Amino acid sequence: MKAYVLHAVNDLRYEDIDIPACPEGWAILKVKAAGICSSDIPRIFTKGTYHFPTIPGHEFSGIVDSVGSAADSSWVGKHVGCFPLIPCRKCEPCSEGHYEMCAHYDYIGSRRDGAFAEYVAAPVWNLVELPENIPFEHAAMLEPLAVGLHSTKIAGISKGDKVAVIGTGMIGITAAQWARKFSCTDDIYVIGRNEEKRIIVEGTGVRYINQKEEKPADDFNVVIEAVGSPSSIDTALNIVKPGGTVVLMGNPSGDIPLSQNTYWRILRKQLTVRGTWNSSYAGRDASDWTEAVKALKDGSIKVASLITHKFSKDDAFAGFNLMHEHKQPYCKVMTIWNS
């Protein structure tokens, strides 16, 4: 099969390799679509991953091609998404069903081979069955959609809350859509620094503030930080109202220093500051993922307009480079496989 194999930092090769093995309890998926996550870019170009060689790609959808156990044969031919985290099932969070906080997890696309390939292996438990009316490109966005949902649940958004999300990536924009759904108000804002993102954000029904041209108000009940930079965290603590909640979701690109003034703001405003990580998943039981599938099916969360670029499997290098070089605005960059 064809795959993008990372052999070392900044050494990604498009090459022929064997289709992965399919042990008992696992499935082989024929990949149909795989989104490029912002975390894939440092993994490929600057920081590397846990071992080499590795195939990146953890946001994907496909069709079940084969299974390792006869008991799972009903999955063959089904359209699926996939929860990429493989829990150890031995640690305390796993025993409580909080698999997203597993202490010893495996992960498709970073700790084991992922979906920038024609085929990918995954445990059957991790498969999310899809209604066939959901396009594969939309289903490949279930992972960031569920992550955005999880952040809004951590925030505890109530009806009527005024909410800001700092960050114009797909997860930030979908978090704002979830916030709008839960607050039942149009008082939901995405804060960015690029005027070209306005049309993408406002196309989902959420308001946009270009921080370079407009100072945000300081009366938000909830602020979700979806960048991971010191300046955006500082903004979050500035614009949340006294007694409000700040949720930290953005992956940090380096150390996040905490100034004395910032610390005072947390104390004097009596803020709740929470972290969020990944998304809840429970197989076929209710979770962030089942809720995300429902939202795609009923159209209550809009994702089509967030796909700003598509590349065929043979041209995916262009997608990786586009995101790495930041020469043009983008939201979700999608790669298409086995079309």
Language-model-detected regions and their locations in the chain:
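Short Gly/Pro-enriched turn/cap motifs at secondary-structure boundaries
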Residues: H7, D18-I19, H51-G57, I108-R112, ...
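Mid-domain Rossmann-like dinucleotide-binding core that forms the NAD(H)/NADP(H) cofactor-binding site
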Residues: I134-E213
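NAD(P)H dinucleotide-binding glycine-rich loop of Rossmann-like/cofactor-binding domains
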Residues: C88-I166
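Short glycine-centered segments of the SAM/dcSAM-binding site in methyltransferase folds
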Residues: H79, K162, G244-T245, T272
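Glycine-rich beta-strand-centered segment in the early N-terminal region that forms part
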Residues: P20-A34, K47-E92, P131-N133
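Glycine-rich cofactor phosphate-binding loops and adjacent beta1-alpha1 units
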Residues: A155, F182, I199-L271
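C-terminal hydrophobic helical "lid"/dimerization subdomain
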Residues: E195, S287-S339
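C-terminal substrate-binding/catalytic core of Rossmann-like NAD(P)-dependent dehydrogenases/reductases
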Residues: I256-I307, A318
